Structure formats: C-alpha cells, structure tokens
Amino acid sequence: MITLNIYICLFYVMVIVLQAQLKQSKGYVRFVTQVIQARRGLKEVKLIYEEEIKPEDKCMFGFFPHGVLAATVLVFMNFNNGPMKNMIGLGSRFLLTLPFVGLFGRLWGLQAVNAHSIKTLLGKGTNVGLLPGGFEEATLTVTDEIRVFIKERKGFIKYALEYNYGIYPVLAVNEHKYFSTFRYF
C-alpha cells in the first residue's frame, strides 16, 4: 500500500512539473469558449464602457464578483477587440499548481498572480485582468445576489500606481448565476 502511494505522489509531482511548462493553446481556448457560451448566463457577451479607454492606455482590470468558475475573466482574456484584447489573466499559484486544473488554466493562458509576474507584465505594458476577491469571494457566491470580498486587497493598487496603470473595475453581470449554489451547510 505504501508503494502505491509513492507512485501516486510521483505521478502528481510529474503532472505539476509538466503543466508548469505549458503555454496557451488557441485551439483549446476556442473549444472551451464555445462550451462556456453554451451554458446559461454567458450566451451573450457584451461590454459596456462607462468611459473611453484608448488603445495605448495601460489597463489593469479588476473583475468582480468571483463566481464559482470565474468564467468572465476566461472569456474576456481572449476577447478579439477593445482594450481587453491580448489581456493576460492572473490566477492564484494554488490554482495553477493543482494537478489537471492548473493544466487547463495554463492552456487557457493564465499566469500566476505574484509580485514577480505582475512586475514583469506591467513592466512590458501588458494589460492584465485579476480577481481581487480571490478564493474568499468565490466561497461567498450565491445565485440570488452579488457578493464582493475586497477586504485588505490593496497590493494590486500599489503596482498599478507604481507602473502608471489605470484600474478598471469590471462588473461581471450574471457570473454568480453560472452555477447553482447554496447558502449554508
């Protein structure tokens, strides 16, 4: 029994190491986009801008609320026009390290949200999208109201100011309705 556990551990370590080397796959993105749009809540994707964003503007998009899947970030990461075109989505290191889940995130084009990757991307002038509420906000998701968790989340604002980026909040309407949820155990 112990040897079986060692093989399983080695397998998962190998998966984690291999998936860390993956880059975005456009074919995978097209396929999953079609699947996501077939689900309820994301059949129509529309952007409504409260103010003009010029193509040369450096943008940091903060998406909220973080639903169960955070599908809105995934859809807009590969939007084919506007300021979100070529936006890099940032996800937690934990998500990107999980076996198989991290594989799908990396194929989609997600990168780790840590100081090094943010400084590198912002230093290049790349538009980025992130979910300031993170896992905590995802656990608050219910289908009948929008809930946001932003307490003590100010590091991204520091980087935006340091690299002269505009911060644009993005309300993902119906993100919380994408999956059925329940309020309490």
Question: Could you tell me what each predicted segment is?
Answer:
Residues 1-9:
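Membrane-lumen (extracellular) interface motif
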Residues 11-33, 39, 53-124, 134-151:
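Catalytic core of membrane glycerolipid acyltransferases/transacylases, capturing the structured
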Residues 41-43:
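Short secondary-structure junctions
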Residues 45, 109-110, 165:
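Short aromatic/hydrophobic-glycine micro-motifs
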Residues 45-52:
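Cytochrome P450 catalytic-domain "roof"
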Residues 95, 134, 140-185:
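A cross-family acyltransferase "interaction/gating" segment
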Residues 131:
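Phosphate-binding P-loop/Walker A region and its immediate neighborhood
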